[in-house]
Amino acid sequence: MPGAVELDENTINPVSDIAYKDDNGNWRAGPDAKKGYEQGQFIDSDYAEKATSIRRTTNLIKSIQRARDVSEGEARELKDDMVTELEKAETKEERRDIWQKYGSP
């Protein structure tokens, strides 16, 4: 698609702080990702979804890290375990219990 924005190391978005690479080379969503998506500032909706997904994942990892008082690496592993358990959960109650188990709201 001509004009579509690709999410890579060369991405520059002068409109807002949509996404950036952290010191470890991982993509992080910027504080304006949701606002940019809502205002239709994206040419490529996949880009908006990636930026929003990155932001949600980052927030989840930070939430687990605070609740469990663990390193970011340990929180990432716990997040992966949590997602696996959530995929297997069959009821709303099971999912709620899993969220509480990992210290997330």
From Swiss-Prot:
Coiled-coil region(s): 59-97
Chief location category: virion
This protein's UniProt keywords: Coiled coil, Virion
Localization (cell): Virion
Highest taxon of source: Viruses
Cellular component terms per the entry's GO annotation: virion component
Extra remark: The virion does not contain any lipid membrane.
Protein name from the UniProt record: Structural protein 11
Organism expressing this protein natively: His1 virus (isolate Australia/Victoria)
